[in-house]
Structure formats: C-alpha cells, structure tokens
Design a protein with these regions (language model features):
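Glycine-rich active-site loop/lid subdomains used to bind and stabilize high-energy intermediates
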Residues: 29-30, 129-233
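Cysteine-centered catalytic environments shared across enzyme families
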Residues: 1-163, 174
Length: 233
C-alpha cells in the first residue's frame, strides 16, 4: 500500500516506512532503487567549475519566471531575509505580464501580494515591510499570539506528521499564515526555501574543513529537505 500521507494507511498495516523521493520500488527486488541522480551531486564533477555570478543570476531568474506559468492567483512568502526577498523581487519583475505568452498580455491579477507572519513587533516583520515597500507588492502582515500558536500545535502535528521540535516550531506560524492565504483565494506561493541548503547558508557551514566536505554537506541537506523545511512549506 502507498499513500501520500501516513494517516492514509492507518488501520491497513502494522509497519510503515517512507517512500524516499527520487526512487522507485519494484516488488520483485523488494527494495528501493534511486533513479534521480545528477552529475553535480559528485564533488569531482563540479570541483573545477568556474564561478559566475552572471550565470547564477540568469539561472535563478529563469527558474522563478518558469514557475509563474499559473492559471490561478499566486503570491510570495516574504520574511525580509535575503532568500525570500530575492525571490519576491524577481517575481514582482514578471508579475504584471503573462509569462505564458512571452509577456504579450497583461496578467489576470497584475498586483503581486506578499505575506509575512510573526508575533506583533517581530523584527522580521519590519524587514519584510521594507522589502515589500521597495519592490512594490501588496503586503499582508499576519500577526498571531502565543496562545494562538499553542492552540494550533495539535493541528500542525496532524498535518506534517512529525514531532520534530524544530519542524513543529517553524511550521506553526506557516500553518496560521497558510489559512489566511487560502481565505484570500491565493492558490500558489513562492518562497525562499532551499537556498540555505544550496548555498551553504547555515552558520555551521563555516566550519567545513574543505571544499569537498562543504559540497557533500549541501547535497546531504538537499536530500533531506522533504523531511524538514519542505514539510512546513
């Protein structure tokens, strides 16, 4: 039996396991086989690659633009940090025109909405508002209380299906924010998730003994995103 959520298997089996992303399962082999393998996962394949800020800029902009091919209203999650601010700025650049027809016609919803969530007075909210004002989004600041956060924890755990403390803590405000976004009719949002894993943005990356260890840790973090940060997203 296979289900997209653990709760869908309740009552049908006595043992459960994860179906890892990038794998397929063949019953005859009784094991998972990895099919998603890219050259860049191996350090030796990338160690001599030249670094190009221009190519990185163009690739990121193209990736964001590609994800704006949407027939439903979309927005951006804007925390005020570097990752989400860059994604929001690129999205705003293309939001007024339909990317499906090479910007020949206006978008059905030309005003880009940005969203930030936090306790009242949180510094992240101040930073998010500054970015929103600068790039020109219709900004929504969602405040919640500690009591509201505590009340939501049971539902959060039900949906993300983990008791991991860090994941639950990060998912709780996201859950409260998602309810507001849904009520506004926004069907899709872009965020800055994954940037720290790709670029080694976490503080402990500074302790990497060499470039090979740094690269291998970024690949490992990317492979585990589905278990942690992508759960909250």
């Amino acid at each position: 039996l296979v289900s997209s959520e653990l709760k869908g298997l309740e009552g049908f089996a006595t043992a459960y396991g994860q179906f890892p992303p990038g794998h397929y399962f063949y019953s005859r082999d009784k094991d998972f086989t990895r099919w998603y393998i890219r050259d860049w996962m191996q350090y030796d394949n990338v160690k001599d690659n030249p670094a190009s800020v221009e190519e990185l800029h163009d690739a990121l902009e193209a990736a964001v633009r590609r994800h704006l091919m949407s027939d439903v209203p979309y927005g951006v999650l804007l925390s005020g940090g570097l990752d989400s601010s860059i994604i929001s700025a690129i999205t705003k650049k293309y939001a007024a025109r339909r990317v499906e027809d090479q910007e020949r016609s206006e978008a059905w919803w030309p005003q880009l909405h940005s969203f930030a969530v936090g306790l009242k007075g949180a510094p992240d909210l101040v930073a998010a508002k500054k970015v929103a004002d600068y790039i020109g989004t219709v900004h929504h600041e969602i405040n919640y209380t500690i009591e509201e956060g505590l009340d939501a924890i049971r539902d959060v755990i039900y949906y993300i299906e983990t008791y991991d403390v860090t994941t639950v803590r990060a998912s709780t405000p996201m859950y409260l924010l998602a309810r507001v976004i849904k009520s506004m009719g926004i069907k899709m949002v872009l965020s800055g998730e994954g940037a720290d894993e790709v670029f080694g943005g976490y503080l402990y990356f500074h302790k990497a003994p060499d470039a090979k260890a740094f690269h291998e840790e970024t690949v490992r973090k990317l492979s585990k995103l589905y278990m942690y940060d992508c759960l909250r997203a």
